[in-house]
Amino acid sequence: MSRRISLREFQENLARRLAEAKTGERRGLLGIQAGSENWLLDLAETGEILTPPALAAVPLTRDWYRGLANVRGTLYGVVDFSRFHHGAPTPAVGSARLLLIGARLGVHSALLVTRVLGLRSREDFEPDSGLADERPWVRERVRDMQDHPWLRLDTSRLLAHSAFLDAGTD
């Protein structure tokens, strides 16, 4: 079911999009949902978005490490991003997607996310004055125009963090 918006909201959104088209501004953020959290990633830090392929299980790994995905001959380590944050496991069906990250850093990693929420503009958000997030890979907390909380992901910090790199069980 689609969200109902007022005529005023529609006109404001349309005017903003037309202004962006004239000035050449791009929507530089990708919105994703992982469990109950909404995340924003810089488009420059992301790769392809895929329907989850068959995953090869890897024994003796943490429950958030879902296995390996073969994407056109390249193996990607797949992390259930919701489960990594102690959320519910993400079923690899329906609207779930595999988001390839880290190629610019020489890392073949993929995040299994609940759904992709589309492209966003930085102007769609304002800083959240609430508490800071303790996770070092959270660049900042922001809120959209409907006052929903979002988290900006710093993929290079995530990919370099020991909690993310240590997928093996103890």
Predicted regions and their residues:
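An acidic, low-aromatic, low-complexity terminal/linker signal
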Residues: M1-D170
